[in-house]
């Protein structure tokens, strides 16, 4: 379990834009998702063109959801893909798990400079 700033988490990820850890995604014991920006790193990243992550426009807000935020869920293979079983087998996963998929794939897309670690 990870404890960060009074948030009891089962998982914690840093969200990178280029080389900057601009935010954190936490998954709590109660399966709640929390996203918060790292304000110090956001200020550094702004000097290189960063503005905000889609769906998280207010950099001072703490975002909470009972489901994985669309920004993150769109970065992993969909549970409904026709070849999802092949993908899971190739990744050595027995079943579909958003958290493990995010961890394994690092949420990388060819279309942007974000990475989830």
Label every model-predicted segment.
Residues 1-117:
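Phosphate/dinucleotide-binding and metal-coordinating scaffold of catalytic cores
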